[in-house]
Amino acid sequence: MAARRIADEPAYVLHSYDWSDSSLILETFTRHYGRVALVAKGAKKPTSNFRPVLLPLQPLRVTYTLGGEGHGEIHALKGAEWAGGHVMPTGDALLSGLYLNELLLRLLAREDTHAPLFDTYAGVVRVLATVDHEGEHGDALEPVLRSFELLLLREIGLLPGLDAETSTLAPLHAAARYALVPEAGLRPALSADRAALSGGQWLALQGALDEPARYTATLRAIATAEAPVAADLKTQLRALLQYHCGSPLLRTRQLMMDLQKL
């Protein structure tokens, strides 16, 4: 029986590692099939057509056959083409993109479809590609990253509702302060909390997440808030993400901390 073939599938390479002297295992994020592991035979050879194409943060179209008996979740890459559209991000934008890739690797189950999240990721990568070494458009990075973190957590069911206290379901008061903490969800802020947002800010974020075009709406809510929310939101979302990722610390986050970029 012929192996099932998946053709012309939109995809991004999240990570790659050696499989043999000449081949690679690719962890990819595909639009219709989620996170998929592919073996790219001969990809390390200088003459391989795969070699210049299988790069992170680049839109691809891949063709592969499903792994047969004994191959489990690893499938055979048969073709890959650059889908075009933008250049490779650099500098802080590149590190940010690799951070998003690590989140997807740590939090997404293999072959669990997340088409809306794929579209959000593709949009974020396009923004990252516009940030140059001198930091042009760099002010867009924070809202974009925070939006993706929120949407990722929501997509995989790890984000509590942002319109009520998690433990009591009491509605939020617009002027009160609330903190999002890993063990308890959203609760009234304490003096010891490193970061918190007002009830009105959390409600605005929940409203954006409920919009049909949730990525655009969430990005707008963060970027245009009357009081800056990105910094306090970063502290809370990073703690929640690390809690669900478990140990060790995210490698890209540690690298950015070492470079004093976080």
Curated annotation (Swiss-Prot):
The keyword DNA damage applies. InterPro entries: DNA_rep/recomb_RecO_N, NA-bd_OB-fold, RecO, RecO_C. One of its GO terms (cellular component) is bacterial nucleoid. Keywords: DNA damage, DNA recombination, DNA repair. One of its GO terms (biological process) is double-strand break repair. It holds the Pfam family RecO_C. It comes from the Bacteria. Transmembrane segments: none annotated. The keyword tRNA-binding does not apply. Involved in DNA repair and RecF pathway recombination. Belongs to the RecO family. This is DNA repair protein RecO. It comes from Acidovorax ebreus (strain TPSY). The gene is recO.
